[in-house]
Amino acid sequence: MALADVGYRGCAALELSKEPICCAVSIHHKLAVKSELTISDLFGENLMLIRRGWNSYVDLLRDNIWENYPQINVVDFPFYDVSVFNQCESGNDVLMAIGNWENVHPLLKILPVQWDYVIPFGLLYSPNPSPQVLSFIRAVAQVYELGL
């Protein structure tokens, strides 16, 4: 399962859902006591976002923050990997995340944010899939009642 943006790396994508964009913080971060964040909670924080061009949905969020909320320091990173989650935790930063990642790191807490930003979530696969992969994709689509 992946955050899916059609055309990313030339892949095809089967979108399974649109997930609200949330934020992850260290369980020791001052925001971790909250059950939900507002945009103003992010003022004065480093907000870690994946680099521009990786996902158009994240780029919309980034553009809105740059244009309207200079109080938030956007920190770009190249790719989601374990070092990014560790940096969020040890650096006391805020990381763009989704709720499905609630168990991605034992010292991070995922918090919903009061905004309307979402990101597609699903399966990425070759634009020319093997018959086995295509069969799997169709089976998943059927389970999700997406009808391919």
Model-derived regions: residue spans:
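Acidic, Gly/Pro-rich loop/turn segments at junctions of secondary structure
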Residues: 1-40, 44, 100-107
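Extended ligand-binding regions for polar small-molecule ligands
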Residues: 35, 40-44, 120-148
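Short hydrophobic segments within beta-strands
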Residues: 24, 48-50, 124
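Short beta-strand-to-loop elements that line the ligand-binding cleft
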Residues: 3, 70-81
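Beta-alpha-beta core module
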Residues: 8-14, 18-20, 82-131, 135
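Secondary-structure junction motif
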Residues: 45-69, 133
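Short beta-strand segments
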Residues: 1-3, 49, 76, 96-98
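Generic structural signal for secondary-structure transition and capping sites
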Residues: 21, 47, 92-93, 145
